[in-house]
Amino acid sequence: MTVPQYPDKHEASALITPDRGDESDDENDRLLRSPDLPSAVVLTFQPELFEHVVAERVAEQIDDVGGLFSLYRLGDHPDVGVAGDFGIGAPITAMVAEQLAAGGVERFCIAGIAGCLQREVGMGEPVVCTRALRDEGVSHHYVEPGRWATADEAMVQRCETAVEEADLPVHRGPTWTTSAVYRETIPEIERYADEGILTVDMEAAALFAVAEYRDVEAGALFTVSDYLGPDEWDPRFDATDDHLQNLFDVAVSALS
C-alpha cells in the first residue's frame, strides 16, 4: 500500500482550497485574504511560548483570520508575525500554513521542541533542521513519493546565521517527523540515530511539503525537550521555557 492510495493524485486539482474561504459566511471557514499580513510568520506549538511572546513583544493581534488559530504582529519586528493557539501535529500545521500562504505570507519558520536522538546536542542548543523524514501522512498528499521533505536552503542558511549571531552552538541536520508519539519504537530510534538524524518532531515534514507545493519558504528550529535512546527515555520538558524563548528570538532574526 502507498500513500496516497489514489494514483496520480499529485496531478489533480483539489475541490477546496484556502482561496475559497472568501466565499463562506461561516467565521471558521473564512480564510485569510488580507493585504495587512506580515510577510513572515513564526509557527509556535507550546502555549507558554506563545503567551510569553504576545505579552512581552508588544504584539498586535491581527483580526479576521477565522477560528483556526491566532495571529499577532510583533511590535519590534512588524514584518514578522507569530501564530499559535492551534495545537500540535502535521495536519493542523499544514492547514495553518495553507491559510497563511493564501493570505500572502512568504516565509515560515517553526520554533518548537523536539526529541533528540544524539546526546552531543546539548539542552538549549538550537537545531537547524535541513530536511525531514516523512513518517507522517500529510506530506505525501502534497509532493511526490520520497523519503525526505526538504527545508528551503535559503531559510536554512538564515537560521544558521541567526544562531551564530546569538552566540549559540549550531547543530544542523535532519529530523524524523512522525504523527505517532507512542509508536516511536526502539528499532526506529536505533536506526535513525545511526543514520545521523538529530531530532524527532511532529510537524516539519508537513510544513516543508506545503511550502514546496505553494512555492513559499519554510524552515524549522528546534530545542531539545527529551532524549531518546534504545535503553532509556530522558524527559527534560520542564527545562525548555527559557530555551524556547531564545529559540523564538533566533527564528525572528532569521525571518527579518
Please place each PLM-identified region on the residue numbering:
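His/Asp/Glu-rich mid-to-C-terminal helical/loop segments that flank catalytic regions of hydrolases
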Residues: 228-256
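Active-site rim beta-loop-alpha module in soluble metabolic enzymes
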Residues: 146-195
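Metabolite-binding pocket within alpha/beta catalytic cores that recognizes anionic/polar moieties
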Residues: 1-158
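Generic non-transmembrane alpha-helical segments
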Residues: 158-166, 210, 250-254
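Non-catalytic positions within long, well-ordered alpha-helices that form the structural scaffold/packing
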Residues: 100-102, 193, 212
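Short acidic/polar active-site loop segments enriched in Thr and Asp
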Residues: 106-107, 198, 217
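Zn-dependent metallopeptidase/amidohydrolase metal-coordination segment
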Residues: 205-239
